[in-house]
Amino acid sequence: MPFVNKQFNYKDPVNGVDIAYIKIPNAGQMQPVKAFKIHNKIWVIPERDTFTNPEEGDLNPPPEAKQVPVSYYDSTYLSTDNEKDNYLKGVTKLFERIYSTDLGRMLLTSIVRGIPFWGGSTIDTELKVIDTNCINVIQPDGSYRSEELNLVIIGPSADIIQFECKSFGHDVLNLTRNGYGSTQYIRFSPDFTFGFEESLEVDTNPLLGAGKFATDPAVTLAHELIHAEHRLYGIAINPNRVFKVNTNAYYEMSGLEVSFEELRTFGGHDAKFIDSLQENEFRLYYYNKFKDVASTLNKAKSIIGTTASLQYMKNVFKEKYLLSEDTSGKFSVDKLKFDKLYKMLTEIYTEDNFVNFFKVINRKTYLNFDKAVFRINIVPDENYTIKDGFNLKGANLSTNFNGQNTEINSRNFTRLKNFTGLFEFYKLLCVRGIIPFKTKSLDEGYNKALNDLCIKVNNWDLFFSPSEDNFTNDLDKVEEITADTNIEAAEENISLDLIQQYYLTFDFDNEPENISIENLSSDIIGQLEPMPNIERFPNGKKYELDKYTMFHYLRAQEFEHGDSRIILTNSAEEALLKPNVAYTFFSSKYVKKINKAVEAFMFLNWAEELVYDFTDETNEVTTMDKIADITIIVPYIGPALNIGNMLSKGEFVEAIIFTGVVAMLEFIPEYALPVFGTFAIVSYIANKVLTVQTINNALSKRNEKWDEVYKYTVTNWLAKVNTQIDLIREKMKKALENQAEATKAIINYQYNQYTEEEKNNINFNIDDLSSKLNESINSAMININKFLDQCSVSYLMNSMIPYAVKRLKDFDASVRDVLLKYIYDNRGTLVLQVDRLKDEVNNTLSADIPFQLSKYVDNKKLLSTFTEYIKNIVNTSILSIVYKKDDLIDLSRYGAKINIGDRVYYDSIDKNQIKLINLESSTIEVILKNAIVYNSMYENFSTSFWIKIPKYFSKINLNNEYTIINCIENNSGWKVSLNYGEIIWTLQDNKQNIQRVVFKYSQMVNISDYINRWIFVTITNNRLTKSKIYINGRLIDQKPISNLGNIHASNKIMFKLDGCRDPRRYIMIKYFNLFDKELNEKEIKDLYDSQSNSGILKDFWGNYLQYDKPYYMLNLFDPNKYVDVNNIGIRGYMYLKGPRGSVVTTNIYLNSTLYEGTKFIIKKYASGNEDNIVRNNDRVYINVVVKNKEYRLATNASQAGVEKILSALEIPDVGNLSQVVVMKSKDDQGIRNKCKMNLQDNNGNDIGFIGFHLYDNIAKLVASNWYNRQVGKASRTFGCSWEFIPVDDGWGESSL
């Protein structure tokens, strides 16, 4: 059944019922206007609003000083009958579109039921309609009747795009927020919509270059209807409660105050800006106002001004407010019913939720300000339908929201030229200095007279920097706890499933009837709603700066389109000063190639190479090793946006590694929590039941405090950190598009330089080029979004949540003292309950409440990031041992106690690598808290660790199983043990039934993947199925364990070589984790990838690769050979020689010799690296050791051919020969420790990866660009893959 009563035409004759001339309150001597009653309590007036407020009767533009920041004026709009007919049909179509969704049906039903409360009488025992909630309807005979209504849709006033919801009057600011409510009118037009820019995401793949989008007008109308619903129910937030921004710094958005009412109406992230303390304040305030309504109904003895009965109206308001009624007819507010209604009105009815139901793209935040206005016509179904909106399935406009794309579906959108938007309001950012020559003329912000380089920055381009005034902080208040203290139920986060539950329980029947109202004065007069005082943004304020900003760097990437060639440069300053020069953060190699003019016959190859290089540049990432933190860094973000004045990719990466996410933030958020107020607990003399209840209430209130602080923390994070990250995301999209625009312009310019004959011989299409560049940007944005989401979550989890937890633990300690004293003081009453209650207090307050982001945020991207890198791993970890602050600690947030023996050793370079030797004092004991010893050992659990097991050297090691990790107590639990060539996992139940899963490896192989090499071990246990062991992320062995009984694990875990016969035996171990779930294969792989720390290069054994340390070399393509030197000097060469020798001990091991051949030493190219660790993309020199003397690996780049033969040269003789090597690390066929060395010439151009080439059966070492082109095209290992082998005690071979 449709929502609109019937199909109306503007020229339909009036009937005094649903088509009539009406007069509205406060209209003075207004002429009656034709109106259409589209549904009970809802009217539409297809006229410009010149009568609701006499001060707004002029449709002409006001003086500029009084214009609001976003405005559009056209006094002729809606002046003809055809326009009014189109308006009427457009509005009714939008109502039907809204009503066609479950959420829309609920909202419109709530509006129809939301009859303003009858509080118009001065006598508290009477109910009387408030006159300004009525209209006067002119009858066909010229008489009039008064009719109560809830909502009027009316055309806009002078500013056509000023859509808003207002009240007709009569002290409305009180009525809309005192629980009564008042009749609402919405200024709206279905003929206009707003443009916005968003990165479109489909299955997490951002689609860029898709143009600007237009808002679905059904979303806009739904937004205003939500305001109307808030105001009809009297729960609108006071307009004085606003979210303020700081405006002092150059980077801060100016003159913006967003009302809490707007944030709540939008929903999503924005609603979270209202902190939990203020939200609780609002909820309690309106709860009390609803109780006032119930009290008024209970007092009412009569009703006046209507033929309706008192009981009927009481039932109407009972239905509206979900009041409870006892047998005597007395009304009350049931807290659970109120909470359900309040959640529906304020959290379920939001713009953000409507977007999901409409299946449209929309601005991600209320702060995404309108950047364009479009004229539309939604009445024809070929343009817009009730079901699909603009995204019509039959017209191929449903994919990627193409129907809302104003460029793809351009016929439906006419952009208005005289729209005054926020871009008219700007700041002037000036860098001091002398401008020596002509500058760009992109805008008037370049002020040469002052010798300053100035740019205009649009207000909406700046950072949203929230003021501390937004965040209340009443957490320090002392709270009284009694036996009757109200305990709040845990809130559910809004989801589509929750909305569907509300829909299924929503009663759509019993719609209120039209009530006969006693005729009021023909001109109803009330009190006008005050107009908000809107001030223009401070315009053109000048800031003198000492450095270039993000906004300068973005401006430097732009260029003037003209007849001259565009030049790319790595200097932002040069680009700012020259009209035809654009700044790029791509490599100098790219700059050199793109700036080079080419002949016509080379054009296609040149253009294709540029596209290929563009993809390489944009997809560059550096990987990290921090679980639940940052796993990748996009290194060019720093130089692209001058983040932290990072002028190079290396500086940016190092800043993230060593200082963390704070390097990304323009302003460091202030986040402070007070010392939380403890509890004042009320005593009950000789009443055990009330005393115990009071203790339980105190513990429950303690849990509420944790939840409240977590929610408060998330609010601060979203407003102060995530908004910054989102702006960087937006600007990086713009930066990549700038690079693509410059690349296209240069290629197109070069093409246009050729003759027509030359062009005819070139198969070139600029659209194909654009498509390929956009594909590259799409791929790059996946990495950028992943990195930025991880940055945001990382700051929350590493900077804000730990601080909150520390404060909460202090609070717990104070609560413990209070409660234990309370128990002691009441011991005479509690008697036998004393010990139980003390244990309950101690156990509850010793356990932290884990933080779950999903309780407070419903953003899918952030939750996915949180889930993938935190929730699925870290939040299931009950033990995570790492080295930090000169000690081993448990990072799982459960704080296990760790006792370390005297003979436990740490690696000097990576202190997470722990050495345990075969001595009693070489022991690590981990004690889990009693409150954390979990029952999961009866269910599912997993463990993971890295281990390096030295070679077994003698027969004493044969058949000698010894334990290294033991969690068995009273003959039940689990352990990890080793034997010759075996890693063994043992589960033992309390009846001593045993199951073992084993990883076996052989020592009788030439080159082993496991002997003395770091191995990643994961063991998972599903009590209903199997126990499994994974090595380096691969499943090795599995055994059924469903037959095992109860397994009572100890709360102590011992790391020790127990039962080993070899006194010289030792092991290395790191990153031990215990999880209370069965990890799946993806989680194991993610854990392996993360902990592999692929941003740092490794040697053969898996240790960090180091500068100034000698290494033997192993080529992975031909591992049976080693590197040797023929002769020193440029005429000499280096080559692969073989085979390797063998090291044999009967029945123990048979291996190839590894310490053979010429040694390489990696030397620093620059002095910036201070920790001696070689990282991915480090630029280095390679020295080779011949007869104990170091020479430099180099080549003459001018050699003929692709392969450049490498030589070992006296270091002073290198001169201008090529010697700089870029170190590369990437997983290759599952080999984690392999490296590539990319040799470059003195201009930074690639000569090629170092490998070998056969010359007369001699495998000479060369640098070849052939490798660079092949790597990535095929998955096999090439001859440019190497491993660096240092001498290691665990291998046992004598070095040369």
Swiss-Prot record:
<comment type="similarity">
    <text>Belongs to the peptidase M27 family.</text>
</comment>
<keyword id="KW-0378">Hydrolase</keyword>
<dbReference type="GO" id="GO:0044164">
    <property type="term" value="C:host cell cytosol"/>
</dbReference>
<feature type="transmembrane region" description="Helical">
    <location>
        <begin position="627"/>
        <end position="647"/>
    </location>
</feature>
<comment type="subunit">
    <text>Heterodimer; disulfide-linked heterodimer of a light chain (LC) and a heavy chain (HC). Interacts with host synaptic vesicle glycoprotein 2C (SV2C) which serves as a coreceptor. Also binds host receptor proteins SV2A and SV2B; glycosylation of host protein greatly improves the interaction. Part of a crude toxin extract that includes BoNTA2/NTNH, P47, OrfX2 and OrfX3; OrfX1 was not detected. A purified toxin complex has NTNH and dichain BoNTA2. Forms a highly interlocked heterodimer with NTNH at pH 6.0, called the minimally functional progenitor toxin complex (M-PTC).</text>
</comment>
<dbReference type="GO" id="GO:0090729">
    <property type="term" value="F:toxin activity"/>
</dbReference>
<keyword id="KW-0482">Metalloprotease</keyword>
<feature type="transmembrane region" description="Helical">
    <location>
        <begin position="656"/>
        <end position="676"/>
    </location>
</feature>
<dbReference type="GO" id="GO:0044231">
    <property type="term" value="C:host cell presynaptic membrane"/>
</dbReference>
<keyword id="KW-0812">Transmembrane</keyword>
<keyword id="KW-0479">Metal-binding</keyword>
<protein>
    <recommendedName>
        <fullName>Botulinum neurotoxin type A2</fullName>
        <ecNumber>3.4.24.69</ecNumber>
    </recommendedName>
</protein>
<dbReference type="Pfam" id="PF07953">
    <property type="entry name" value="Toxin_R_bind_N"/>
</dbReference>
<keyword id="KW-1133">Transmembrane helix</keyword>
<feature type="binding site">
    <location>
        <position position="262"/>
    </location>
    <ligand>
        <name>Zn(2+)</name>
    </ligand>
</feature>
<feature type="region of interest" description="Belt; not required for channel formation">
    <location>
        <begin position="492"/>
        <end position="545"/>
    </location>
</feature>
<dbReference type="GO" id="GO:0044161">
    <property type="term" value="C:host cell cytoplasmic vesicle"/>
</dbReference>
<dbReference type="GO" id="GO:0008320">
    <property type="term" value="F:protein transmembrane transporter activity"/>
</dbReference>
<feature type="binding site">
    <location>
        <position position="223"/>
    </location>
    <ligand>
        <name>Zn(2+)</name>
    </ligand>
</feature>
<keyword id="KW-0528">Neurotoxin</keyword>
<keyword id="KW-0645">Protease</keyword>
<keyword id="KW-1015">Disulfide bond</keyword>
<feature type="binding site">
    <location>
        <position position="227"/>
    </location>
    <ligand>
        <name>Zn(2+)</name>
    </ligand>
</feature>
<keyword id="KW-0800">Toxin</keyword>
<keyword id="KW-0472">Membrane</keyword>
<keyword id="KW-1036">Host cytoplasmic vesicle</keyword>
<dbReference type="InterPro" id="IPR036248">
    <property type="entry name" value="Clostridium_toxin_transloc"/>
</dbReference>
<feature type="active site">
    <location>
        <position position="224"/>
    </location>
</feature>
<keyword id="KW-1035">Host cytoplasm</keyword>
<keyword id="KW-1043">Host membrane</keyword>
<feature type="disulfide bond" description="Interchain (between light and heavy chains)">
    <location>
        <begin position="430"/>
        <end position="454"/>
    </location>
</feature>
<dbReference type="InterPro" id="IPR000395">
    <property type="entry name" value="Bot/tetX_LC"/>
</dbReference>
<feature type="region of interest" description="Translocation domain (TD)">
    <location>
        <begin position="449"/>
        <end position="870"/>
    </location>
</feature>
<dbReference type="Pfam" id="PF07952">
    <property type="entry name" value="Toxin_trans"/>
</dbReference>
<dbReference type="InterPro" id="IPR012928">
    <property type="entry name" value="Toxin_rcpt-bd_N"/>
</dbReference>
<dbReference type="GO" id="GO:0005576">
    <property type="term" value="C:extracellular region"/>
</dbReference>
<dbReference type="Pfam" id="PF01742">
    <property type="entry name" value="Peptidase_M27"/>
</dbReference>
<dbReference type="GO" id="GO:0008270">
    <property type="term" value="F:zinc ion binding"/>
</dbReference>
<feature type="short sequence motif" description="Host ganglioside-binding motif">
    <location>
        <begin position="1264"/>
        <end position="1267"/>
    </location>
</feature>
<dbReference type="Pfam" id="PF07951">
    <property type="entry name" value="Toxin_R_bind_C"/>
</dbReference>
<dbReference type="InterPro" id="IPR013320">
    <property type="entry name" value="ConA-like_dom_sf"/>
</dbReference>
<keyword id="KW-1051">Host synapse</keyword>
